[in-house]
């Protein structure tokens, strides 16, 4: 069995044209996301970005921005979209992966995503302090919402994503991003 990797070692690892995460010290390497994944992610990012900018409430981070969620062994996850409230923003001079979870994480499923892996990822986010997680399934045209209090919701294409107490006042019909 290979030795466990640290977040610092992950930061120094370059695997061209691949997506990487660190899960309890084990390197996870995946293929780049496909077109539909990127399209749905960007559609939501544009809407979230307009809201966050108009409200001045924090900052969005782009896909593949890593966050250190736990140490010894290290876990570094990267959401497709993340939002951090203004009062929790890391120092811009910070290098490496911030040791925190965003307040909102968005995962857009790809055809090769496994349900158990997705649930484990959501669990890691919530355990590390995320307050809201949206898992969007473009193929099934639905979204599952996970909250820090343990409640869940299932949204159909005709329903709207709601920022709840993380992004109060934000609402986006799911169908408009699919």
Region locations from a protein language model:
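Gly/Pro/Ser/Thr-rich low-complexity, intrinsically disordered segments predominantly at protein N-termini
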Residues: 1-178
